[in-house]
């Protein structure tokens, strides 16, 4: 990106700005650069942020807006930065060590399928994604019971896509598929388990 005309004029009276306009990476040679200098440097070259020992939040935003994947190189990025990154590139959440819950929601907001990028998704995230797309239950390694129930209540035959459904999930699914209530006795639950097991083998 090119320098602004106003920056060029200002650089006539500011040697540090003049240095950065010539070579943004040279900000590393400036002790405690101002926020404006940091932002100018990263706007011209996003990699300049690696030369700043304590980059300001505004400079970080400039970088994330240009390249969301740069969040990988930021220590403890703020919630706002995490959300900004995953809103632009959902799979960038894989580069965040401990993504916040709001960033996870932002990741699946437009496409619930993006849950595949989230390691060990929280219960709330699982349920939110499954509400939008019940068939996604098959992509969850260990879906929580709430997510299982959400799936079968919306689409009963998703029971056959759940590796180890809970007894309660199987009961609800069979009731939905059969169209009538089933008394949850031990005998009935054993029968339901057998039915589901047999269906898996089909």
Feature-to-residue mapping (PLM):
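Alpha-helical scaffold segments
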Residues: 2-202
């Amino acid at each position: 990106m090119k320098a602004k005309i106003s920056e060029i004029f200002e650089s006539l009276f500011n040697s540090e700005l003049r240095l950065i306009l010539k070579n943004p990476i040279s900000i590393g040679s400036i002790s405690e650069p101002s926020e404006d200098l940091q932002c100018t440097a990263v706007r011209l070259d996003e990699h300049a942020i690696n030369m700043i020992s304590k980059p300001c939040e505004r400079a970080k935003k400039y970088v994330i807006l240009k390249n969301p994947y740069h969040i990988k190189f930021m220590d403890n990025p703020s919630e706002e930065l995490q959300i900004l990154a995953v809103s632009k590139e959902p799979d960038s959440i894989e580069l965040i060590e401990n993504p916040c819950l709001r960033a996870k929601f932002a990741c699946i907001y437009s496409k619930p399928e993006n849950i595949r990028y989230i390691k060990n998704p929280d219960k709330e995230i699982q349920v939110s994604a499954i509400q939008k797309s019940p068939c996604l239950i098959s992509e969850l390694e260990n879906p929580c019971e709430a997510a299982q129930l959400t799936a079968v209540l919306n689409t009963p035959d998703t029971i056959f896509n759940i590796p180890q459904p809970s007894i309660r999930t199987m009961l609800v699914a069979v009731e939905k598929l059969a169209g009538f209530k089933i008394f949850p006795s031990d005998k009935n639950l054993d029968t339901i388990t057998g039915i589901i097991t047999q269906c898996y083998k089909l």
